[in-house]
């Protein structure tokens, strides 16, 4: 049988079901002449849940223009699911028929400027959040160069359209379709009274605009980027923008549409 030429990396969590699927899928791919490559793949298949897809994204976040992703779920239905663990034959068949088509979603770019001149740069598929460890966080919010408000509360999160269904949704933010290339700024337990006021609702910021957060105190802040957590002291400002790169998923008949993903994840079957 002729080699397909497609290079594939398989990334799985440590759960027994995911490991079983990993070995089965690896064997089927080899028998069908796919190339297993964990450094320079064409397609990355994450096996597990949405957390595993985030890990796969961050492993290849510097190769986004070259890589396409597939989510294979082994537990309860996940938001980034394209295939279930009993659909391996279907997956291999679709890979054989793959023409290179892709479905693309926006990614968040985060720049943390420290007072010592260092700049830390991150990418997020879902969201990036900032909190203060032990007390109320106070930060000025600047949107596209315009001072907007002084926030007081537990923290703030900035999400992508696909990330709008994650932590952002649990905070009461809106669900945003990924064809709308925008960011969403959502408050975490804001402090509102006769003295201190914030807008009190999520803000949708278009692709060309930039969000800046300027903490007013120089102590430690905790920054979460998807499923990774960092602690920084003496932050000068943080900038959030839509990244120049997108995440690309393999566009096959099994790639679930965004609204079907939302329905399956949060609503389920609707009774007639």
UniProtKB/Swiss-Prot annotation:
Keywords: ATP-binding, Cytoplasm, Kinase, NAD, NADP, Nucleotide-binding, Transferase. The active site is at 50 (proton acceptor). InterPro entries: ATP-NAD_kinase_N, ATP-NAD_kinase_PpnK-typ_C, NAD/diacylglycerol_kinase_sf, NADK. The keyword Lipoprotein does not apply. One of its GO terms (molecular function) is NAD+ kinase activity. GO terms for biological process: NAD metabolic process; NADP biosynthetic process. Its EC number is 2.7.1.23. It is found in: Cytoplasm. It catalyses: NAD(+) + ATP = ADP + NADP(+) + H(+). One of its GO terms (cellular component) is cytoplasm. Its main location: cytoplasm. Pfam families: NAD_kinase_C. Its cofactor is a divalent metal cation. NAD(+) binds at residues 50-51, 126-127, 152, 154, 165-170, 189. Belongs to the NAD kinase family. Involved in the regulation of the intracellular balance of NAD and NADP, and is a key enzyme in the biosynthesis of NADP. Catalyzes specifically the phosphorylation on 2'-hydroxyl of the adenosine moiety of NAD to yield NADP. This is NAD kinase. It comes from Streptococcus pneumoniae serotype 4 (strain ATCC BAA-334 / TIGR4). The lineage of its organism: Bacteria, Bacillati, Bacillota, Bacilli, Lactobacillales.
């Amino acid at each position: 049988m002729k080699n397909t030429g497609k290079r594939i990396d398989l990334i799985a969590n440590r759960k027994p079901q995911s490991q079983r699927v990993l070995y089965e899928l690896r064997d089927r791919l080899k028998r069908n002449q796919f190339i297993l490559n964990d450094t320079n793949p064409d397609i990355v298949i994450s096996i597990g849940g949405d957390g595993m897809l985030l890990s796969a994204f961050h492993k290849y976040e510097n190769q986004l223009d070259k890589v396409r992703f597939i989510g294979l779920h082994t537990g309860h239905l996940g938001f980034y699911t394209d295939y279930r663990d009993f659909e391996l034959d279907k997956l291999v068949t679709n890979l054989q028929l793959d023409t290179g088509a892709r479905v693309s979603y926006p990614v968040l770019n985060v720049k943390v400027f420290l007072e010592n001149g260092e700049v830390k740069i991150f990418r997020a598929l879902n969201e990036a959040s900032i909190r203060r460890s032990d007390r109320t966080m106070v930060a000025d919010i600047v949107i596209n160069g315009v001072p907007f408000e002084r926030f007081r509360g537990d923290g703030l999160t900035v999400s992508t359209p696909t990330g709008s269904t994650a932590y952002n949704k649990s905070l009461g933010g809106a669900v945003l379709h990924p064809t709308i290339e925008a960011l969403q700024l959502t408050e975490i337990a804001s402090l509102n009274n006769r003295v201190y006021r914030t807008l009190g609702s999520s803000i949708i910021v278009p692709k060309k605009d930039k969000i800046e957060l300027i903490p007013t105190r120089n102590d430690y802040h905790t920054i979460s980027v998807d499923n990774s957590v960092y602690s920084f002291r003496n932050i000068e400002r943080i900038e959030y923008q839509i990244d120049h790169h997108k995440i690309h998923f393999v566009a096959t008949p099994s790639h679930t549409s965004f609204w079907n993903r939302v329905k399956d994840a949060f609503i389920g079957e609707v009774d007639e």
